[in-house]
């Protein structure tokens, strides 16, 4: 008898209590991660159930808070002294790294939940010393309590830091309620070493076990990795926000670094001008820290001992702070006025020729040739240094497109200041969603295209009588009801709880690029929109001032069709509807930005393409998480949408019913029927169900169908709906979940700024 190799790595000593020991994840690492549908609920939130963050923020003495933050900037503490007597550079980096994890593909990351406080972000090599920044802020957070979240405070502090150093910002919006646990839904990469990128790139770098510094790799890796960064990632290395400042994989090549910069910043929604403005503007202030080699740096916060109290990277070099600080391993101060806004960065970038050198920690950086020592020392006023730059700074000079922009900014400082102000605002607010969520006295009045603007309601809304009339007209239009349901779902399910983008409001389903997405059945979409536009035209031409938007009609049509389907199944029920949506124009829609939201898969519609198909069930859970759904909500929606016959291509996969179009619990009844035997149809993506006795073919199904009978937790939920007493509960739960999805983007209704509940 042979002994199989253990399916998991040997683990450090674990307690035999409190969840210790070998876990299901250890045994089956590829198991469906339903835990991401159970996060950020009332169970983990210490605040009262009726706590309203928006109301709390509005009661904040905002100017007093900003005054306290300004005072903190120059209140240097012995336990962590301020460079140049000013914490501005540190706090700008804190805010930047809080927001800079955002990526366009799934909207995850960003500043919106204050996740920098939790693992893994609190222990990333790129966030060394930001643990100290947050501790410097604690007395102010303690003073103002729940009136300002950590998520808002970190961004506001970055703004105040800029203002205190003479820069005029574009504005600030609050409205980021905190979460209370580490986010487990975001994919940060598969590498198992800090700074590694051998999984996200072909020919990548295996990483390092060193902590806290970016030591150039001199021996094992001389070939720059390929340029195809894994989707949805937006960082070149595990544990970095964007790129390696030494250059790709530690190779000091400014041209190659420009490729990485353009890719990663683009995946964070920044164009070339915004990228140049952010790098040049941000590096106008402060310095980097690399006083000594990496072996002086201790464990990161998550690995440090209890006595460290959540701090990490203890530094045994000298005093371990001030002039002895080790953060990135680079030792660069960009300008002669590191606590004042200036054009020095761009002036020096083009004025000097640059020579490759190394920091005291051994990291590649650049020093100005034949330059005078004009750069101040952070802690000794009697000392000066030559100007220094990072490899990625020089990219702004040697990449032709970046150089053109940088020279224009050099010649036109006013354009540079405006571009940096706007790019900084976009960086720090990109994941907040619509302006309806913005709070505070410094919200800028200018409406920006990346905010996905929707016109304000400018007419009387339809009332209950109008709604009833419209529903009757819609149902009598002759359009198959599944087209209305499919269109409503296609519109509403674009919502992402990550960055609060998408949803039915705006009716962008009729505009490029959404109208052309493969997942949106084109004939069904066209016939539904054509019928609804005719209904809208007739209603809005009545002359009584009342109007109805196409966005409202899309949702109303779906609701009316669901009501009819429930009635046809013998379960009359009212599907809620609240008007107030408006229609966006094509000019108000950033096509490139929205193109990133096109789904690879949507298991609710049995849609998956390319590499998504073999993992359709995992994509389904990911989609459910973005829709703020719980496992029961996901389950009931899939079961309902199947019997409503709304597969994106009209196929019968998973349509386990003899009465398609009726809102019944048939999907669950037939899925769990032990008289059906399932077999793989040959590719692991499609399955056939046959009668166990006769062998006759009964059903076909995808992975997104059979997972509800295969996965133990989902099967337990499915059993509730498949039971003899589960039919009415199924209909009620489906309608509740449907209504939730239809209104995920209705921040105008919610009032409260909370993390949407997973019921």
From Swiss-Prot:
It is found in: Cytoplasm. The active site is at 97 (proton acceptor). GO terms for molecular function: catalase activity; heme binding; metal ion binding. Binds 1 heme b (iron(II)-protoporphyrin IX) group per monomer. There is a cross-link at residues 242-268 (Tryptophyl-tyrosyl-methioninium (Tyr-Met) (with W-96)). The keyword Membrane does not apply. It is an enzyme of class 1 (oxidoreductase). Formation of the three residue Trp-Tyr-Met cross-link is important for the catalase, but not the peroxidase activity of the enzyme. Gene3D superfamilies: 1.10.520.10, Peroxidase, domain 2. GO terms for biological process: cellular response to hydrogen peroxide; hydrogen peroxide catabolic process. Its EC number is 1.11.1.21. Residues 1-24 are annotated as: Disordered. Heme b binds at residue 283. The record marks 93 as: Transition state stabilizer. There is a cross-link at residues 96-242 (Tryptophyl-tyrosyl-methioninium (Trp-Tyr) (with M-268)). The keyword Ribosomal protein does not apply. Its cofactor is heme b. It comes from the Eukaryota. It holds the Pfam family peroxidase. InterPro entries: Catalase_peroxidase, Haem_peroxidase, Haem_peroxidase_sf, Peroxidases_AS, Peroxidases_heam-ligand_BS. Keywords: Cytoplasm, Heme, Hydrogen peroxide, Iron, Metal-binding, Oxidoreductase, Peroxidase. It catalyses: H2O2 + AH2 = A + 2 H2O; 2 H2O2 = O2 + 2 H2O. Bifunctional enzyme with both catalase and broad-spectrum peroxidase activity. Homodimer or homotetramer. Belongs to the peroxidase family. Peroxidase/catalase subfamily. This is Catalase-peroxidase. It comes from Neosartorya fischeri (strain ATCC 1020 / DSM 3700 / CBS 544.65 / FGSC A1164 / JCM 1740 / NRRL 181 / WB 181).
